[in-house]
């Protein structure tokens, strides 16, 4: 929320997120292709977030770790997208040097239950404790927004703000 305020006043540039499939991420020419795009468009990677789904960690954690480190060394930021939809493991989060954890909308849908609130709050706290910013997906109303703000979410996405553009 502070980020949005700073962006409004022109102090920082908006982030551009790019979703990458597991297949693309694990391909051998993935990093080379990104370097070419950066060069071609004279793009500075610090404002680009590469979003990978947690599934990539199931293929080979060491390869995923290496590719994430290479992306970050180039200046990109990296997010684990849809956290909690697959075989989430908190253990791999501490092994991966990512900038953001994007928590899946199913956790927002459970905010009407006490257990759901506790789980979401704990995931946010764990993410912060390992140095990750948290993006909550699927916020659709004011009460959900207020809860995730109280829980400490750094960023939110959802239909409450805008329907997706095609």
Predicted regions and their residues:
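Conserved functional hotspot residues or short segments at active or partner-binding sites
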Residues: 67
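Catalytic-site microenvironment of enzymes
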Residues: 35
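EAL-family c-di-GMP phosphodiesterase catalytic domain
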Residues: 4-7, 21-28, 47-62, 74-166
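Catalytic core regions of nucleotide second-messenger enzymes
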Residues: 7-14, 42
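Short catalytic/binding micro-motifs of nucleotide second-messenger systems
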Residues: 2-9, 38
């Amino acid at each position: 929320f502070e980020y949005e305020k700073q962006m409004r006043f022109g102090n920082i540039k908006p982030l551009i997120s790019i979703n990458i499939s597991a297949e693309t991420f694990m391909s051998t020419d993935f990093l080379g292709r990104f370097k070419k795009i950066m060069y071609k468009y004279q793009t500075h990677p610090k404002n680009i977030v590469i979003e990978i789904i947690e599934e990539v960690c199931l293929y080979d954690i060491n390869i995923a770790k290496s590719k994430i480190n290479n992306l970050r060394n180039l200046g990109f930021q990296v997010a684990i997208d849809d956290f909690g939809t697959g075989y989430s493991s908190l253990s791999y989060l501490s092994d991966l040097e990512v900038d953001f954890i994007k928590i899946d909308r199913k956790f927002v849908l459970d905010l009407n239950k006490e257990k759901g609130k506790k789980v979401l709050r704990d995931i946010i706290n764990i993410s912060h404790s390992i140095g990750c910013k948290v993006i909550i997906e699927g916020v659709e109303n004011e009460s959900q927004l207020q809860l995730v703000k109280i829980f400490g979410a750094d960023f939110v996405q959802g239909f409450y703000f805008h329907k997706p553009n095609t």
